[in-house]
Amino acid sequence: MKRARIIYNPTSGREIFKKHLAQVLQKFEQAGYETSTHATTCAGDATHAAKEAALREFDLIIAAGGDGTINEVVNGLAPLDNRPTLGVIPVGTTNDFARALGIPREDILKAADTVINGVARPIDIGQVNGQYFINIAGGGRLTELTYDVPSKLKTMLGQLAYYLKGMEMLPSLRPTEVEIEYDGKLFQGEIMLFLVTLTNSVGGFEKLAPDSSLNDGMFDLMILKKANLAEFIRVATMALRGEHINDQHIIYTKANRVKVNVSEKMQLNLDGEYGGMLPGEFVNLYRHIHVVMPKEKAEQLDD
């Protein structure tokens, strides 16, 4: 019998997963999985639980939570030689990674069905400073809002909490001097932010990295150069439509490796969570983890 381990964050997404847990377990049992669960209790717990489950040779590990929970599970699996297949049940606020995979984000039971009936494909992940990420890494004051927003506010307001925090931060945004090397090229200058992405879905923007691929061995690198408040707002508005990539303030390109040096303190954002401080070198790990996705999405990757 196949064995599945569900690692879930009991506080994610208005604490809704706990209410559906019995039904989710029933679905997996009916699909032929011997299924057990682990409820996370603190930061880093999902990483430890994922590593432990992998060493116990579970066939499938399901991360049920937000992008931060998925990131922790990936960090438990990525360093191992034998990595179980990863399934995702999105229960967070933004759910960027699930959006990129085409996994239902509004219905936990439909997401569970996708994990059961979907297809596993190997996808790229990123590594920087000994840590792993599966969706996005970045730096710049605005990228910090994803972990500056209190958990209780996210639980109450959902995505709106991020918009409110972003509006609050806008007047205080200022550029930072950086040096960014990417595949033999060099950018030196002041930036508002930079993003190293693996999917097209970033911070709820579905077209921020429109050329991204889950399995091409390349990051999408986006650099927003120094801009005043009006220019910044204009670029952000264009980003909703994916039209920002041709703007004069934007560098948008593909890269397998990205090295960032900073002249002043800059925090590192990994999948929406605090990832320490820069500098850092971002390395793309080609098709490193098998992830379950809808059959239609898998067919797109196969083309």
From Swiss-Prot:
Q: What is its EC number?
A: 2.7.1.107
Q: Which GO terms describe its biological process?
A: phospholipid biosynthetic process
What is the enzyme's main class?
transferase
Cofactor annotation: Mg(2+)
Q: Which positions are annotated as binding Mg(2+)? A: S213, D216, M218
Give the top-rank taxon of the lineage listed in the UniProt record for this protein: Bacteria
Gene3D superfamilies listed in its UniProt record: 2.60.200.40, Probable inorganic polyphosphate/atp-NAD kinase, domain 1
Q: Where does ATP bind?
A: N9, P10, T11, S12, G13, T40, G66, D67, G68, T69, I70, N71, E72, T93
What region holds the DAGKc domain? 1-132
Give the phenotype of cells or organisms lacking this gene: Cells lacking this gene are not viable. They exhibit accumulation of diacylglycerol, disappearance of phosphatidylglycerol, and the cessation of lipoteichoic acid formation.
Which residues catalyse the reaction?
Answer: E273
Q: Which InterPro entries match?
A: ATP-NAD_kinase_N, Diacylglycerol/lipid_kinase, Diacylglycerol_kinase_cat_dom, Lipid_Phosphate_FormReg, NAD/diacylglycerol_kinase_sf, YegS/DAGK_C
Paste the cofactor note: Binds 1 Mg(2+) ion per subunit. This ion appears to have a structural role and is required for catalytic activity.
Q: Which reaction does it catalyse?
A: a 1,2-diacyl-sn-glycerol + ATP = a 1,2-diacyl-sn-glycero-3-phosphate + ADP + H(+); 1,2-di-(9Z-octadecenoyl)-sn-glycerol + ATP = 1,2-di-(9Z-octadecenoyl)-sn-glycero-3-phosphate + ADP + H(+)
Which UniProt keyword terms apply here? ATP-binding, Kinase, Lipid biosynthesis, Lipid metabolism, Magnesium, Metal-binding, Nucleotide-binding, Phospholipid biosynthesis, Phospholipid metabolism, Transferase
Q: Which SUPFAM superfamilies match?
A: NAD kinase/diacylglycerol kinase-like
Give the family this protein belongs to, as stated in its UniProt record: Belongs to the diacylglycerol/lipid kinase family.
User: What does this protein do, in the record's words?
Assistant: Catalyzes the phosphorylation of diacylglycerol (DAG) into phosphatidic acid. Is a key enzyme involved in the production of lipoteichoic acid by reintroducing DAG formed from the breakdown of membrane phospholipids into the phosphatidylglycerol biosynthetic pathway. Is more active toward long-chain DAG compared with short-chain DAG. Is not able to phosphorylate substrates other than DAG, such as monoacylglycerol, ceramide, undecaprenol, phosphatidylinositol, or sphingosine.
This chain's protein is named Diacylglycerol kinase
Q: What species was this sequence derived from?
A: Bacillus subtilis (strain 168)
**UniProt lineage:** Bacteria, Bacillati, Bacillota, Bacilli, Bacillales
**Gene behind this chain?**
dagK
